[in-house]
């Protein structure tokens, strides 16, 4: 097996374990807060949002830093540093005695949440541009698979062993992934990086992005996709309750989440392959339109089964969006600054993770949950229009130049 293929297999496994582990603790965070003292329901709900959101906010701020450091020092050392940081943050969560300590550790976890983005940059840098979509789509399958099994496994462990031991087990699994990278990954130097030249400053990188519309449009698209996806997630359990009632609510809410993940898992690699063949922007426009269309029946759903079917179909479209966006950036970004550029893209991704629940909550509180589905459908449609306009503008520019 070649070094590149071996690295890919190991990073895929590490992504699976890290993604599964970080999502294992999500289902019971609010329940864990309740055990720390006697709080009102409003306090628990408010601080559950703070504790959940602070990780994404900090990750949004520091992602370019990890990308830039990876370009300078190598991706492997960043994988080990961020993985160890996540493992320690989660380990200490098992010892907290107040919600403020938990908040601080979730903040610290956000500062070191660079494992999966860095692994993406590493594999992208070692992959030929002609097969980037297929490779990155396959890599995302590891992340999606982990996020599918993580919440289910975390809930089972919490019921069986309690919250504290679940934190310990989660930390151990992530640290095992770090050891897997340490002993298994062999980073290959890139020709662009080994050439002697003056390193790019952050100002030069930002200037490069600004003068490449294809790059910043993709970053805006990343934010829009994540905003749309996360705008519904906090409301899904409430919507399932409206459609199905309170019987086995947690189980059926989990099914609604898993339906999307399963759809993504099935076609993520295929969409990436099609993007390599026919152009990532062309595939992205189709997927954004499909995602928009599949959201409208969810707003009109009269039963849980209808919701599950269209959550699954939406997942099939969603599975190709981020891999194709990343592959399109891979084609445009020079290898010497690719990590930092992907870091900025990840920042936009985390910004969408923060904005999505905020927008969904505001819309649903002022109108209805169904209204949030309509707004999300519009966001995906707007993304398709933005990409189509950019494509048309580029074609017109080339025609005038010739």
Describe each region flagged by the PLM.
Residues 105-143, 328:
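Cytoplasmic helix-loop-helix junction between adjacent transmembrane helices
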Residues 56-64, 114, 147-148, 261-269, ...:
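Residue-level signature of mid-helix packing/kink "hotspots" within the transmembrane helices
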Residues 28-45, 235-251:
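Short amphipathic helix-loop junctions that connect adjacent transmembrane helices
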Residues 60-97, 275-281:
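Conserved MFS/SLC helix-loop-helix module at the cytosolic interface between two early adjacent transmembrane helices
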Residues 1-5, 187-218, 402:
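Juxtamembrane intracellular "pre-TM" segments in multi-pass secondary transporters
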Residues 166-183, 373-389:
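Symmetry-related core transmembrane helices of the 12-TM Major Facilitator Superfamily/SLC fold
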Residues 3-31, 35, 212-231, 312:
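Pair of pore-lining "gating" transmembrane helices in MFS-fold secondary transporters
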Residues 89, 100-108, 294, 305-313:
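Paired small-residue
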